[in-house]
Amino acid sequence: MKKAILFDLDGTLLPMDQDIFVKTYFGLMAKRMSQFGYKPDELIQTIWKGTSAVIKNDGVLTNEDVFWKCFSEVYGDERTKNDRVKFDDFYREDFPKVQSACGFQPLAKEMIQYAKQQGYRVVLATNPLFPRIATEERIHWAGLLPSDFELVTTYENSHACKPNLLY
């Protein structure tokens, strides 16, 4: 039987002060989305509401579906459906600037390579609150590649979050 090592990303492979990270992240998102009529305070409050719902996910839906269902309750199904591409654009174009709120762990790549050389299955078990695009971006900030891991948890492929036992 092959054994696995599960690594966390935020604060482990990718050093960060979570408060600074969140402030930078939400500030950039609010600025970007305000040009599409989103009120910054309402948007951030809605994101926290969706995040809270994801953390409480009972496992029936993916974390992604739980988040966007919550978002739709505030902004409506049609607007949510139409604007999801705008959020994807944010993650492609603006989210990379959030790297300035993170540090760098020079041993991260070496740790992952060593674990794989020892025959371990290597999983990035980061709390799946983010879409794949944002998680993969943060993996790159850590000097790693998504392909360094057998599995990377994201809100698209997960039905629960830490510390839920379903995770």
Feature map (PLM): residue ranges:
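Active-site neighborhood of HAD-like aspartate-dependent phosphohydrolases
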Residues: 1-49
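Short, solvent-exposed loop/turn segments at secondary-structure boundaries
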Residues: 17-20, 58-59, 99
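Short, surface-exposed alpha-helical segments at coil->helix boundaries
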Residues: 23, 65, 132-137, 165
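Short helix-capping segments at alpha-helix termini
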Residues: 34-40, 78, 143-148
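A metal-dependent, Asp-based hydrolase signature
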Residues: 45-92
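Substrate-recognition element of Asp-dependent hydrolases with the DxDx(T/V) motif
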Residues: 89-92, 96-104, 108-142, 152-153
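Conserved Lys-Pro-Asp/Glu-containing loop-to-beta segment of HAD-superfamily phosphomonoesterases
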Residues: 151, 160-167
